[in-house]
């Protein structure tokens, strides 16, 4: 899972949750560029499914999907206008 939020440090905003069924990697990023880099890193390490938070707008989802095409499936939680970001799209804030 990758979330995007202002002032997020992608080196320290990380967690791993292990269950008997799956391992959930959580990475926070401050913009789409870091989101793409995190997704590529995850896919290269063998992660097969990446879910993006609602902060990723349509353009951000497309950027990540293109970057990991053929290596990982990409899904997304969706808000057209995110309530946590003053009802703006991530496409307005994080490119």
Regions found by a protein language model. Give the residues of each.
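Hydrophobic faces of well-ordered beta-strands that scaffold small-molecule active sites
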Residues: 1, 25-27, 51-52, 74-76
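N-terminal basic/disordered segments at the start of proteins
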Residues: 1-9
